[in-house]
Amino acid sequence: MMRQDRRSLLERNIMMFSSHLKVDEILEVLIAKQVLNSDNGDMINSCGTVREKRREIVKAVQRRGDVAFDAFYDALRSTGHEGLAEVLEPLARSVDSNAVEFECPMSPASHRRSRALSPAGYTSPTRVHRDSVSSVSSFTSYQDIYSRARSRSRSRALHSSDRHNYSSPPVNAFPSQPSSANSSFTGCSSLGYSSSRNRSFSKASGPTQYIFHEEDMNFVDAPTISRVFDEKTMYRNFSSPRGMCLIINNEHFEQMPTRNGTKADKDNLTNLFRCMGYTVICKDNLTGRGMLLTIRDFAKHESHGDSAILVILSHGEENVIIGVDDIPISTHEIYDLLNAANAPRLANKPKIVFVQACRGERRDNGFPVLDSVDGVPAFLRRGWDNRDGPLFNFLGCVRPQVQQVWRKKPSQADILIAYATTAQYVSWRNSARGSWFIQAVCEVFSTHAKDMDVVELLTEVNKKVACGFQTSQGSNILKQMPEMTSRLLKKFYFWPEARNSAV
């Protein structure tokens, strides 16, 4: 992931780049440096105007991290964009751990000099180094830059606890794992390696405190849900197996950081849904096109039961999921593969999608409260839409449907999407235990699938992540808020079967 100061620098000067970049020359260099590939180039060239092509180049560089920033700086120098290169120079090949960035007004002399060298209107940060940093030779190879950037990203990990009021595991609970205090976190990527062993979660004393145990999940040992099935208000989910679950786990990328810790997510989810009665299929490290083909084949599979689960663990941005080839795929295109038109075997059946990926670069600093409250905050409560609410449509609902044999149903119905975070924000992942969101999903579902429908479960997940997890970046305490989008027409229960029962 690109450092925030570098990303902000590109964002502030986007108008300069969209006015002066020579598209063909820059693309040629970036493809030669393997920052972009030919598919990226075709996508950029398909943009309608030259200005849009220039903007898309900058956006593509932002998606590809610090290595791409340095390569972009080299490309500007080598193609005669001296003024634009001057904009990036203060942060090019800089070691973040030895520098403090801040915005400050230039002296008049410096301002006149920089205006003469660069296009008018750009802004560039000033850097003050704590220690002297040796300059990088202009003849440094791209591989050297890449290796140094990768090691630099490791040194920039945020050292903090990811859980609010977190209780440490018992001694030797994880003999092969780093302690919680030494775990590292980054938005969308974390550093270190995770164990492949399955874990389950149990609640410690006091609110929002959790302890991890190395034991199989035992959520199905409890009695099944006691309420009577009502076909008018509940989806049927009694087939054996309950259905199919596809888990796409992208860990290693061509340019973007490795998603260390995602193996723990995959193992825990595999264990969870197998115990819930699903046939689990895992696919690792898929390209953008590979994801689409895999989901398409999954949607058309002949062995579906009463419901279907799709889990995507990858890098992402708003409305896109990124494959291991760094190609972004529209989430709308993914969800369309699951609709009734493209997946007729899943028509009228609930399809639950979990997306563990960043949806932007913003970080949630939270807000102060007087005390801890378990209730849902008022700003999360949704009101009725005045135009599409029940009163507005009342007359249309009660009119008699004379001589109608078929009634139409939206093809996009019966889908629920659970996002790890809200739009434009990062999601967080622990290098040893996996992502906050998936940890909460496994804990809540293993405890309450027997007596809650999926919307209730995900509301509880929202509360667990919002109240039970946090990390720090300097003096800032950072939080995360999951989000769900429901197109379900009935309540959906997993109906887990009881095991180890005396009956």
From Swiss-Prot:
First and last residue of the signal peptide: none
Give the Enzyme Commission number. Answer: 3.4.22.60
This molecule's function is given as: Acts as a cysteine protease in controlling programmed cell death (apoptosis) by proteolytically activating or inactivating a wide range of substrates. Component of the egl-1, ced-9, ced-4 and ced-3 apoptotic signaling cascade required for the initiation of programmed cell death in cells fated to die during embryonic and postembryonic development. During oogenesis, required for germline apoptosis downstream of ced-9 and ced-4 but independently of egl-1.
The segments labelled Disordered in the record are 106-129, 150-179
- Please state what the protein is called: Cell death protein 3
Keyword Membrane among record annotations: yes
Spell out the GO cellular component terms annotated for this protein, sorted alphabetically and separated by semicolons.
Answer: caspase complex; cytoplasm; membrane; mitochondrion; neuronal cell body; nuclear membrane; perikaryon; perinuclear region of cytoplasm
**CARD domain residues:** 1-91
